[in-house]
Structure formats: structure tokens, C-alpha cells
């Protein structure tokens, strides 16, 4: 090692140490002065991990629900390095937090780790940059646009049916199939075509992974494992980001591929749009209706103020954003739907009867939306098995959060609001709210699609963008693609439940939910295999 290299490393080490000491001092001051210290909650389990180890060891949200039962609607628990973290199920407080997106933003730690993989796309940016991106992207996710894309959803759902029929023909029926694997392939193919008219061809039995598919796989695996020690330290201590590691190199290589291919797509689409504007008639087909094309069209509109336009870099950042947001959540939600149907055979058959009541294998968006029991099954799946069980916000300024239900602080004083200090983290309990007995009744944990025939009045106060639940959040940062996801999910369930009968391949107690950013199924006795949902599948034969 040269003298120069040694000096550089020493300089980085000194800088990293200085930043670490400074951050430690700031954190100690925040812990000591945060108003959250006066809120009741569970005892600290560990100085370094706080209560996080026990949270990660438990099923998603189970521990939080126990804390609510013991300590009340508004509590605090300990996060990294014993930092206080606010947790409330008060719907007025949650509505306030979600509707004030400037004052309550994603934490810098999460933004860095996600941003390293995804770039500065809609999932990452905050404030005016987020509003600018969302303003341009909103039209691409409207009902009319999703209606045009439904054909892709149905086509790929039918291709998944063929994919599974091929597996059944090889092993006999019923065949044990990991449905999560097939659903992930299907949703990746959908977002490729519907997102930017690119064919991943994941469901092609004889196909080979293409370059963009491989790059996305590398980036997605990096997202799954971001909470390891060195990436965590790099997020907390910026000078460490200058030190390369294997994960960073893999991400950089994959992003280089994605950037090159993304810019090729953007350049091609811009040229096509400009040619059409110059007088060449553009073909009115699905190729011109993908989300990226619609985004570029909106961005090139002549009546759009220059200050509202996105740069090519901003447009490019939406490619990995589309892939991640439009792929993993829908595949997992549909997997949990199939799981729920195996645990309620009468619901599965009632749903199948409804799906066979319409005389087509290629339903439109309107036909899918006119099936009431399918709607109820999707709503109940998203309520009980929310793909994203929680999220985090950080107070960007000192503030006072209003409450519906007062709490008694550690000094015995009744408080009708929550005081927070700049930097205080806040846990947003999506799944806890979705299955709160106080809101939904004593059967809140049960999968009962019939509940949607008459929902309790209390759920009207839940601050969600859809169906009186928080699965797609609410406020200015509510999921922009929720209509896309719901119609894709309906198309999948329509095709699969018409075509097959499903049973769980292992005892129900073997299925557990992995506590990650997205709620994934695992088999308790087969953890080494990673996320999977093995079902016994056989073709359904009409009488």
C-alpha cells in the first residue's frame, strides 16, 4: 500500500470518527431532551438495539399490538442506540402526520439505503422535488390509463396459468408449487411491459434472463439485505461512503446497466413522441400507453411551465422505482390472498363461483370492478395481510400532534396532544391499524370478506387513500400506483382461482411472516430456502 493510500485511509478514518462522535453527542442530547421520554412504553431491552431485536423476532406487528393492550394507544419504545420512537394508533394523530408530509418525512437512514439502489425517484425524494415528480406522474396512474393496461395484466395472468399447468404436467396433480416464485415472475413481466414497454420474459419456460432482468435482480437482492452493519454505518457516517465494498460495487455495476438501458428507452420514447407531435401519426396501441411514455409525454407538454419539468435524470430515476414499487408488493399481496383462500375453502369456492359467472376469460377493468365478492376478497386481503406492514417518519421540526384519545404520561399527567422535537422518529403502524379490534371489532384478525357488506363506523376515521385502511397510506405521499396494483391483483386472482384449486402444502403453523420492508411468507422448518409459499395446486374442472 502506498503512502498516499495510507494517508487517504487515515484521513477517512479521522473524518469518520469525528462524524461518529458528533452524531453520538447529538443523539444523546436528543434522547435526553426529547418530549417522547415522558410517554409510557415497554422497558428498554438492550442499549444498542433497544426493543428492535424483540420486534424483529416476533411476527409482524404482534409485539406492537401487545404494547397497545398494555400501555394504551400512544406509547414510546426504543430504537437504535436506545433512541425514543413514537408509536400511536390514534387515527387523528396519524391523519395529522400523514397529511403534513413536509413536517414528517422518511428518515435519512432509509432514504440513503433506498436511494443508493433506486436513485432519486418518487419513493425517495421529499418536499418540492416530490411534489414536482408526482405532479407529472399523476396522470399516468389515473383510471383511464389503468383501464388501457388491464389487457397486459390479464394476458400475463393467463401466462402464469400456463406456467403452473406445465409444472403440474411434470409432477402430477396436485403439484406442490411455490406460488410466490411464479407471482414474482408475473408481476415483473407486467411492470416491464406496462411500465416501459420492456419484455422481461420471466414466465418464458425456455427463456434466459436478459441484461436488465439480471441488473434488477442484483439491485433487488441488495434492497433485501440493506440492514447489515457496514451499509448501516455508511448511512449514519457519510465519510465511510467513500470506502468501497462488495455490495456497493454490485449495486454500482447494476445501476450502470440500468442507467444505460433506461436512457436508451427514454431517448427512444422522446424521439417517437416528438415525431408524432411534428405530424407523424402515432400508432394507438399499448406500446404508446406504458407508464414511462405517459410520463415523458406529460413532461414534454407545451403548456407545462419550464419550472415544473423533470430532468432526464429525474425521469430515469422512475425506472427502478416502477420496478420495485410495482413488482414486489403486488406479488406478495396476491400470495397472501391465495394463502387466505386455502384457510377458508368456502370463501375460495364462493369466489370461484362468482368469477365463473361472467362469460369471458379476458375481463376488462370495469368487468373486474363489477365483481363484488372479488372486491371484498381483495379488500380483506389488503387489510389482514398488508404487504407493507409499517413505515417510519421523522419530525423535521418541533411540533404538537393532536389526539382523539388523551394518554397519561409517566408523571401521571393527562395529555391531549403529543409534543415532538425535530429528529424524533415516528412508527406508522399500517398493519396494527388495519386489524385493530377497537376499530374493526373482536374478529379483526379473522379473514372475513363478508365484513365489507357493512363496515363499522369507527373505520371511517382511518387516514387511508383506499377502502378505510392504511395499506396504501394516505395524504400527499399515499401510493400513487394503488389503482394499478389493485387491478393487476384482481386480474391475477380472476385467472388463477378460475383455473385452479389451492390447498396449503404445509401445516398452517409452519407459515410465518418475515419482518422486512415487504411482508413475505416463509416456511418455519425450511428457513434456509428463503421466502416461499408452497401450495398444492390442481386444475379446477367445472361440473
From Swiss-Prot:
SUPFAM superfamilies: Cytochrome P450. Pathway: Secondary metabolite biosynthesis. Its cofactor is heme. Heme binds at residue 479. Disulfide bonds: none annotated. It is found in: Membrane. Glycans are attached at residues 332, 434. The chain crosses the membrane at residues 9-29. The keyword Oxidoreductase applies. Its EC number is 1.-.-.-. The keyword Cytoplasm does not apply. Gene3D superfamilies: Cytochrome P450 (1.10.630.10). It is a single-pass membrane protein. GO terms for molecular function: heme binding; iron ion binding; monooxygenase activity; oxidoreductase activity, acting on paired donors, with incorporation or reduction of molecular oxygen. Keywords: Glycoprotein, Heme, Iron, Membrane, Metal-binding, Monooxygenase, Oxidoreductase, Transmembrane, Transmembrane helix. Its main location: membrane. It comes from the Eukaryota. Belongs to the cytochrome P450 family. This is Cytochrome P450 monooxygenase 169.
Amino acid at each position: 500500500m502506498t503512502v498516499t493510500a495510507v494517508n487517504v485511509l487515515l484521513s477517512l478514518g479521522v473524518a469518520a470518527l469525528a462524524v461518529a462522535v458528533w452524531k453520538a453527542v447529538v443523539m444523546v442530547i436528543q434522547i435526553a431532551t426529547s418530549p417522547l421520554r415522558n410517554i409510557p412504553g415497554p422497558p428498554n431491552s438492550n442499549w444498542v438495539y433497544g426493543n428492535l431485536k424483540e420486534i424483529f423476532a416476533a411476527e409482524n406487528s404482534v409485539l406492537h399490538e401487545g404494547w397497545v393492550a398494555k400501555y394504551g394507544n400512544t406509547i414510546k419504545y426504543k430504537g437504535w442506540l436506545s433512541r425514543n420512537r413514537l408509536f400511536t394508533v390514534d387515527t387523528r394523530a396519524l391523519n395529522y402526520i400523514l397529511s403534513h408530509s413536509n413536517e414528517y418525512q422518511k428518515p435519512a437512514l432509509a432514504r440513503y439505503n433506498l436511494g443508493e439502489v433506486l436513485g432519486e425517484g418518487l419513493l425517495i425524494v421529499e418536499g418540492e422535488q416530490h411534489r414536482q415528480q408526482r405532479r407529472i406522474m399523476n396522470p399516468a396512474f389515473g383510471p383511464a390509463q389503468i383501464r388501457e393496461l388491464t389487457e397486459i395484466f390479464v394476458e400475463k395472468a393467463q401466462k402464469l396459468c400456463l406456467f403452473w399447468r406445465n409444472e403440474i404436467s411434470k409432477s402430477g396433480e396436485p403439484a406442490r408449487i411455490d406460488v410466490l416464485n411464479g407471482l414474482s415472475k408475473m408481476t415483473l413481466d407486467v411492470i416491464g411491459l406496462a411500465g416501459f414497454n420492456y419484455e422481461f420474459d420471466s414466465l418464458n419456460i425456455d427463456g434466459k434472463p436478459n441484461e436488465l432482468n439480471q441488473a434488477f435482480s442484483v439491485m433487488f437482492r441488495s434492497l433485501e439485505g440493506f440492514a447489515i452493519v457496514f451499509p448501516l454505518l455508511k448511512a449514519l457516517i457519510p465519510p465511510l461512503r467513500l470506502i468501497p465494498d462488495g455490495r456497493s460495487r454490485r449495486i454500482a455495476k447494476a445501476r450502470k446497466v440500468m442507467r444505460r438501458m433506461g436512457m436508451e428507452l427514454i431517448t427512444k420514447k422522446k424521439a417517437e413522441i416528438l415525431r408524432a407531435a411534428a405530424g407523424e401519426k402515432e400508432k394507438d396501441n399499448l406500446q404508446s400507453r406504458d407508464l414511462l411514455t405517459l410520463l415523458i409525454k406529460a413532461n414534454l407538454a407545451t403548456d407545462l411551465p419550464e419550472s415544473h419539468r423533470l430532468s432526464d435524470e429525474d425521469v430515469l430515476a422512475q425506472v427502478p422505482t416502477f420496478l420495485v414499487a410495482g413488482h414486489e408488493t403486488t406479488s406478495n399481496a396476491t400470495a397472501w390472498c391465495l394463502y387466505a383462500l386455502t384457510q377458508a375453502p368456502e370463501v375460495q369456492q364462493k369466489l370461484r363461483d362468482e368469477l365463473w359467472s361472467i362469460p369471458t376469460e379476458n375481463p376488462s377493468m370495469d368487468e373486474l370492478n363489477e365483481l363484488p365478492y372479488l372486491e371484498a376478497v381483495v379488500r380483506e386481503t389488503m387489510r389482514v395481510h398488508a404487504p407493507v406492514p409499517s413505515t417510519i417518519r421523522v419530525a423535521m421540526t418541533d411540533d404538537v400532534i393532536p389526539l382523539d384519545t388523551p394518554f397519561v404520561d409517566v408523571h401521571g399527567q393527562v395529555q391531549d396532544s403529543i409534543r415532538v422535537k425535530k429528529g424524533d422518529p415516528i412508527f406508522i403502524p399500517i398493519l396494527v391499524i388495519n386489524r385493530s379490534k377497537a376499530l374493526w371489532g373482536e374478529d379483526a384478525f379473522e379473514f372475513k370478506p363478508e365484513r365489507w357488506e357493512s363496515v363499522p363506523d369507527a373505520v371511517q376515521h382511518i387516514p387511508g387513500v383506499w377502502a378505510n385502511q392504511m395499506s396504501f397510506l394516505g395524504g400527499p405521499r399515499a401510493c400513487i400506483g394503488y389503482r394499478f396494483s389493485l387491478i393487476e391483483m384482481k386480474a391475477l386472482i380472476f385467472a388463477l382461482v378460475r383455473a385452479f384449486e389451492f390447498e396449503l402444502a404445509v401445516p398452517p403453523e409452519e407459515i410465518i411472516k418475515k419482518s422486512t420492508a415487504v411482508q413475505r411468507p416463509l416456511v418455519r422448518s425450511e428457513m434456509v430456502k428463503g421466502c416461499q409459499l408452497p401450495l398444492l395446486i390442481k386444475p379446477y374442472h367445472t361440473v
